[in-house]
Amino acid sequence: MIQKETNLVVADNSGAKKVRCIHVFGGTGRRYAGLGDQVIVSVKAAVPGGVVKKKDVCKAVVVRCAKEQRRKDGSYIRFDENAVVLLNAQGEPRGTRIFGPVARELRDRKYMKIVSLAPEVL
């Protein structure tokens, strides 16, 4: 579960390394974001020469979440870290590579570009 002020790892090669959630999409009172949900993040650490710089504000989608999430078949999925992939204005990933596994819930949410770039879908 991701909420405001949650520190996240970036799972793509857009140039950002660490980001912080500053808003969760989905209505006024929505507090938490899970796998496949969109958030607005602020870049806290970035590599020199990357597409994004420190202090940039951009949209992102949650691809790994440390809090277990229940699936329709009754199983649970959880990861070791909270990770996001940065998105452009059209909702496509800003980077050209995805690092680490991503959740199957992204396929249900129509993030097919992220699913195809990911090395593993769990």
Swiss-Prot record:
Coiled coil: none annotated. Keywords: Ribonucleoprotein, Ribosomal protein, RNA-binding, rRNA-binding. GO terms for biological process: translation. GO terms for cellular component: cytosolic large ribosomal subunit. The keyword rRNA processing does not apply. GO terms for molecular function: large ribosomal subunit rRNA binding; structural constituent of ribosome. It comes from the Bacteria. SMART domains: Ribosomal_L14 (SM01374). SUPFAM superfamilies: Ribosomal protein L14. InterPro entries: Ribosomal_uL14, Ribosomal_uL14_bac-type, Ribosomal_uL14_CS, Ribosomal_uL14_sf. NCBIfam families: rplN_bact. Binds to 23S rRNA. Forms part of two intersubunit bridges in the 70S ribosome. Part of the 50S ribosomal subunit. Forms a cluster with proteins L3 and L19. In the 70S ribosome, L14 and L19 interact and together make contacts with the 16S rRNA in bridges B5 and B8. PANTHER family: 50S/60S RIBOSOMAL PROTEIN L14/L23 (PTHR11761), LARGE RIBOSOMAL SUBUNIT PROTEIN UL14M (PTHR11761:SF3). HAMAP family: Ribosomal_uL14 (MF_01367). Belongs to the universal ribosomal protein uL14 family. This is Large ribosomal subunit protein uL14. It comes from Chlorobium limicola (strain DSM 245 / NBRC 103803 / 6330). The gene is rplN.
